[in-house]
A protein has these predicted regions:
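Conserved helicase RecA-like core
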Residues: 1-173
Length: 173
């Protein structure tokens, strides 16, 4: 469920200096950012309903570390260059494999290593496998307590490895 994915995302956010999180819709981006803020995680939001000034302010907050999580739609997947982003999280999977590649390309820039995590629940597994099949990813389905220090290995040298987290169960407090 979306609530379970939000809880896991909050945990991921605490393990990285900063993260870019992609959502499918503008409303979903705003809602997720609000939920993360209520959990004590500083966020900024970029999507098509934001003015250029609002987008620039959000980028500046993220670059300076005032916001540790940037929640965005695919607007941020192309043309935005931010160095040293250690992790990209696909909160909502895109429909097009090219969008997955562009989103994922926001991490691991300038010769640095990066991690890509896709948060899915059990019902999304078949669609995700189909999406990733053509991208030559080594897809690893893992539980929410996955070890982020062990990234997936590329299928072939020079390709991207992806970790897809399957949210089967999240313990409640």
């Amino acid at each position: 469920s979306r609530d379970n994915r939000t809880k896991v995302l909050a945990e991921i956010a605490t393990q990285y200096e900063r993260a870019i999180v992609f959502c499918r819709t503008k409303h979903g981006s705003d809602r997720l950012a609000g939920n993360l803020e209520s959990m004590g995680i500083n966020t900024c939001v970029i999507h098509g309903n934001r003015s250029q000034a609002q987008r620039e302010k959000a980028l500046e907050q993220f670059r300076r570390g005032k916001a540790t999580v940037m929640v965005a739609t695919d607007v941020a997947a192309r043309g935005i260059h931010i160095d040293a982003v250690p992790v990209v999280v696909h909160f909502d999977m895109p429909e097009d494999p090219k969008d997955y590649i562009h989103r994922s390309g926001r991490t691991g820039r300038a010769g640095m290593k990066g991690t890509v995590i896709s948060l899915i629940d059990k019902s999304m597994r078949r669609t995700t496998t189909s999406l990733c099949r053509g991208m030559k990813f080594d897809v690893i389905y893992d539980e929410p307590n996955f070890n982020l220090s062990e990234p997936a290995k590329p299928v072939r040298p020079g390709e991207i490895g992806a970790v897809v987290a399957t949210l089967l169960k999240v313990e409640s407090d």
